[in-house]
């Protein structure tokens, strides 16, 4: 660290243009690589009594229905108004963090009217339980009583990623806990409609949408009834594809478009249960409001645990009309799709609100349906009709995000090709909006282009610099004039900022003879626009973000990627390693940092743990308190300028890497903060 001084980096800007129909596509993608492993969970489950398929693990014999081992008379009257079934897949959320146990504590503290309502939890899927006295090698059914949870039965662990396990639990509840209405709550990780819900830690399995459909058909469908609501206390599950699966079996869906923080739902909502059956839309409003209120309460006390929040109650009885209207709109859009209008379509797609990519390690391709229709629809009659139909099925929703209307759809863009194909396969299997699926197929058929790089130093690029009225930072508009052909083919772009390691004093020629060729990555962004004159604009604030603690300001900037485009702030990700010296525990994490009018020097919103488990790609619900750690390390490797055989500059990420790592440490026990210089 050093004394704080005003400084400017000597930087180098690379502008990237992505045209759209040249051969040899080299568009950057979000690494996925493990999707095939997810589809092959069945073969890795280690269960000798199961049969494998890419749809999951199925028992060769139906799962046995657990029989209660409790004196019902000792519990008082069994409620007849409402039965809420909670399928709690503990996963690492319980084994590592105890979140399932904490939520069960919340349920007990809610003061549920157990005389008229049944709340039954099926708990399993975790390698160990932090509390509650539950066994990681077993599954347990518990009934909420006025004295807390009472175990009904414990038996050897079933695979909670098996649809038979879920249907068996629900049939058990139908048989032993009859009521006027039933609801189902699915608790755990979520991965959106492509990956599905729940991660059984013991069997390495999850429930895909086709498996969820199978489980509901074999339980709700078999009993010729309909659930009042189905809720996901899980990430990324408020989507039209999920709604299509649930619509035959429930009146309402309650779920989040975005990832959820580790604390998940606020189970104080159970206190509203009474001697009347509460309609699903009314209960949905209770659940949404309690979730949002608790989140704001947490953020007031722990600003470094800030998260984007969304929660919606979807009217599944209005779903069919929404799908039909959307299907009609995309039939029209697909007819007009060609290589001439494709670039404009891609530019608009890049602006649509994405979910999950800012708060996880993946690009899930989940976009807000209403925002998508606004940007892609060109104000057409079919787009307006689709918008009205989608709005009509959103019974209630709330959020602290921009452009989060309540329900999403999977529209992969710049994702792994396997993930993209899996999205289409999923939609085809479900019979979901076939014209939309056909549009995606045609969209990807055109998406065969080559990446054209235009690299220019700031000093040579056309730059305008103005000073804000408060004088806190400078604004640079870095521009690049495109040729007519480039303009016609331009789809999307990005830029990254490099600094010269030697000129910044990070390295000397004595330490490395190639020091003059060495650059350090500082910042990357997709905040690039094309104006009506064919000029590409990259808005770069002519400064960088540093860390400051009691020892001063860091020698090098934070390494930032702007992965979420917001109209009200700049949002960055930065990879760090956290350390506790007492037990030498370390945790790789991703900081979410925001710079806005309220925080011109930036603020660390939260820290998300990075999993070392390559098999599991569901979105992380857990957040890290930086105050629980003593030290934070930031490091990046320098690279040498590298050109191809024709002398053309390669993409920075294809440059030759050096042996030199540049970095710094931050004392988290001190008064640390971010600063912009």
What is each PLM-predicted segment?
Residues 123-224, 234-236, 240, 257-258:
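Catalytic-core segments of thiol-dependent peptidases
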Residues 26-28:
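Bacterial signal peptide processing site
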Residues 21-24:
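C-terminal motif of bacterial Sec signal peptides marking the signal peptidase cleavage site
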Residues 5, 31, 35-38, 42:
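Composition-driven recognition of long, low-complexity, acid-poor segments enriched in small hydrophobic
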Residues 83-88, 118-123, 182-186, 228-232, ...:
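Structural recognition of the beta-strand scaffold that forms the well-ordered cores
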Residues 39-178:
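N-terminal extension/subdomain marker
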Residues 2-13:
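Bacterial N-terminal signal peptides that target proteins for export
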Residues 44-77, 193, 197-232, 237-677:
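Terminal, contiguous helix-loop blocks that mediate binding/assembly
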């Amino acid at each position: 660290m050093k004394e704080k001084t005003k400084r400017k980096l000597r930087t180098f800007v690379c502008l990237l243009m992505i045209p759209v129909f040249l051969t040899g596509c080299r568009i950057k993608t979000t690494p996925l690589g493990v999707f095939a492993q997810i589809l092959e969970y069945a073969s890795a489950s280690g269960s000798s009594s199961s049969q494998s398929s890419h749809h999951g693990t199925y028992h060769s014999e139906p799962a046995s229905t657990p029989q209660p081992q409790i004196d019902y008379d000792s519990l008082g009257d069994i409620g007849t108004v409402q039965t809420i079934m909670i399928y709690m897949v503990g996963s690492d959320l319980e084994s590592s963090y105890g979140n399932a146990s904490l939520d069960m504590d919340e349920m007990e503290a809610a003061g549920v009217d157990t005389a008229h309502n049944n709340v039954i939890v099926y708990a399993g899927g975790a390698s160990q339980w932090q509390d509650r006295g539950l066994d990681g090698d077993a599954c347990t059914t518990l009934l909420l009583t006025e004295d807390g949870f009472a175990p009904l039965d414990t038996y050897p662990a079933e695979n909670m990623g098996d649809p038979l396990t879920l249907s068996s639990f629900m049939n058990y509840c139908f048989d032993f806990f009859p009521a006027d209405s039933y609801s189902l709550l699915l608790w755990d990780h979520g991965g959106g409609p492509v990956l599905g819900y729940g991660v059984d830690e013991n069997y390495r399995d999850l429930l895909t949408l086709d498996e969820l459909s199978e489980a509901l058909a074999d339980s709700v469908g078999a009993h010729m009834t309909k659930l009042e609501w189905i809720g996901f206390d899980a990430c990324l599950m408020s989507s039209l594809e999920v709604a299509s699966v649930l619509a035959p079996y429930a009146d309402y869906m309650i779920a989040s478009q975005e990832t959820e923080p580790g604390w998940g739902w606020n189970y104080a909502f159970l206190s509203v249960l009474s001697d009347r059956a509460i309609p699903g839309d009314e209960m949905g409003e209770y659940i949404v409001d309690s979730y949002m209120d608790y989140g704001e309460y947490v953020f007031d006390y722990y600003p470094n645990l800030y998260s984007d929040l969304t929660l919606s109650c979807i009217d599944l009885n209005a779903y069919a009309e929404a799908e039909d209207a959307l299907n009609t709109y995309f039939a029209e859009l697909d007819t007009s799709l060609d290589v001439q209008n494709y670039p404009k379509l891609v530019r608009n797609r890049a602006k649509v609100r994405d979910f999950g990519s800012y708060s996880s390690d993946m690009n899930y391709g989940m976009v807000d349906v209403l925002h998508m229709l606004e940007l892609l629809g060109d104000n057409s009659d079919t787009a307006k009709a689709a918008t009205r139909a989608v709005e009509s099925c959103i019974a209630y929703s709330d959020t602290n995000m921009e452009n989060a209307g309540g329900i999403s759809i999977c529209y992969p863009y710049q994702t792994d090709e396997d993930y993209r194909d899996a999205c289409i396969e999923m939609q085809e299997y479900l019979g979901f909006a076939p014209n939309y699926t056909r549009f995606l197929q045609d969209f990807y058929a055109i998406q065969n282009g080559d990446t054209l790089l235009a690299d220019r130093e700031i000093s040579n690029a056309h730059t305008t610099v103005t000073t804000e009225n408060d004088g806190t930072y400078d604004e640079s508009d870095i521009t690049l004039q495109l040729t007519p052909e480039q303009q016609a083919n331009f789809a999307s772009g990005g830029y990254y900022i490099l600094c010269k390691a030697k000129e910044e004093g990070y390295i000397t020629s004595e330490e490395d003879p190639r020091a003059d060729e060495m650059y350090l990555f500082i910042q990357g962004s997709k905040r690039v626009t094309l104006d009506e004159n064919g000029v590409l604009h990259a808005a770069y604030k002519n400064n960088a973000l540093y860390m400051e603690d009691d020892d001063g300001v860091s020698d090098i900037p934070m390494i930032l990627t702007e992965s979420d485009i917001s109209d009200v702030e700049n949002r960055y990700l930065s990879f760090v390693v956290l350390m506790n010296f007492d037990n030498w525990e370390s945790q790789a994490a991703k900081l979410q940092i925001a710079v806005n009018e309220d925080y011109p020097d930036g603020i660390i919103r939260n820290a998300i743990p990075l999993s070392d488990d390559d098999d599991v790609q569901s979105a992380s619900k857990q957040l890290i308190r930086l105050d629980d750690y003593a030290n934070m390390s930031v490091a990046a490797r320098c690279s040498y300028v590298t050109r191809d055989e024709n002398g053309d500059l390669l993409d920075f990420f294809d440059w030759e890497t050096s042996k030199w790592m540049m970095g710094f440490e931050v004392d988290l026990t001190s008064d640390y903060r971010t600063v912009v210089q």
